[in-house]
Amino acid sequence: MGQITIRLPFPVSINEMYVNRAGPGRSRYPSPVFKAWTTEAGLLLNTQRPPRIGYRVTIHIDLDDRRQGDADSRIKCVLDILVKHGILVDDRKKFVKRTSIGWEPVEGCVVRIERATDE
């Protein structure tokens, strides 16, 4: 398999993904910002039709370098949408050997997925 390239909107930070419910106990639920991002990302994935990947991969995530924030806080959002839409079976180490993330001159977010090599 060659490399699979997927375009996504700029991912939300892990700090923006969930909000705490008021009241007794500690209940978390998806934030409106995360729900909106998930909807937009899902629509983009549906138009790109990436294949389902059932083997171990390395994932490279390129973020729009005109944006601000911590790159590492955006990995979970990207992996979760890939699993939710069935592109990845799971994001456990059995299926995802390595992730890398950085800032590049791209629009939104570009995800490159390739078969992991044994080292």
Predicted regions, residues:
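Acidic, proline/glycine-enriched N-terminal capping motif
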Residues: 1-119
